[in-house]
Design a protein with these regions (language model features):
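Active-site cavity-forming subdomains of large catalytic enzyme subunits
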Residues: 1-221, 225, 234-248, 263-270
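Core structural elements
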Residues: 231, 235-237, 242-290
Length: 290
């Protein structure tokens, strides 16, 4: 319980400074698991999805709510409840939700064979295991995404295979979730800066027989964009320094400010060491039409 509420507190502190965040919930015990407190058994994932969602909605950023991504491994025994959570109108309205699919699950869905869920998900000796129909659960994911636009899917084994930072997992760069809109997978306390290049703007003589894409200009601008993004990291670090100065100068007792101060110190260190950036594209459809 302590870790769950620590995440909630850190989320609120981040969002009050106009930040967004992604949480992976795969560490939470499945519903019905024994716990050593007065509740005796765990309530599972869904109540905590609601808690994090409500925190996002409650902390306004200049009148706008924060941004939150919740994810869970398909290996988790409560993943089906997670997948169904937003099918009820009014539930988990403050978060995007995505399910992390592994190669084993996708192969089982194709072959029509059972798939084993367990908790803890990466344990060699799990305390809980169950078999499910992978094909049926995959069809439910597709149906729910069609019906409510969620959950999103993260092909997690592919993400990890192609993730350069995971070469440094032993140094704290093990990828655990994504930013709120899912563009970039990140490790705990890491942050991202994203820039999109408008492809339509590189179409010369659009909507004519002489239309062509200016690859040379595009190549030049991609290099400049990445250069700019690296500079933005340093600007962000300066901003975090000012945030920490503001926290230090606030009149509250140090024990009240400690969680937020430690949080921003972790983000500052991870941002400076990892220097994560993302350069993407937009207006691909307009480019093709032109």
């Amino acid at each position: 319980y302590g870790a769950i509420f620590k995440v909630d507190e850190e989320q609120v502190q981040l969002m009050k400074r106009r930040g967004g965040v992604g949480h992976d919930l795969s560490h939470i015990r499945p519903k019905g698991s024994p716990v050593k407190n007065s509740a005796l058994t765990s309530t599972g994932l869904v109540p905590f999805m609601e808690r994090y969602s409500n925190s996002t909605r409650e902390v306004a950023q200049d009148g706008r709510r924060g941004a939150l991504m919740l994810s869970v491994s398909i290996k988790h025994p409560d993943s089906e409840s997670f997948i169904d959570a937003k099918m009820t109108e009014g539930k988990v309205t403050g978060a995007n939700v995505s399910v992390k699919l592994d190669d084993e699950f996708m192969q089982a869905a194709v072959d029509g064979t059972p798939y084993v869920q367990q908790y803890p998900i990466n344990s060699a000796n799990p305390t809980f295991k169950k078999e499910i129909d992978a094909s049926a659960l995959w069809k439910k994911i597709v149906h729910n995404a069609w019906k409510s636009a969620e959950p999103g899917v993260l092909f997690w084994d592919t993400i990890i295979r192609e993730s350069v930072p995971d070469c440094y997992a032993d140094l704290g760069y093990r990828t655990v979730s994504t930013n709120p809109c899912g563009e970039i997978p990140l490790c705990p306390y890491d942050s991202c800066r994203l820039l999109a290049i408008n492809l339509y703007s590189y179409v010369v003589n659009p909507f004519t027989p002489e239309a062509y894409f200016d690859f040379e200009l595009f190549k030049k601008h991609v290099g400049l964009a990445q250069r700019i993004m690296d500079d933005i990291i340093d600007l962000e670090l300066e901003k975090i320094e000012r945030i920490m100065e503001k926290i230090d100068s606030d009149p509250e007792d140090d024990n009240v400010k400690q969680t937020e101060r430690v949080l921003w110190d972790k983000i500052y260190k991870k941002s400076g060491q990892g220097r994560r950036t993302g350069v993407g594209i937009t207006a691909e459809g307009d480019m093709l039409a032109a």
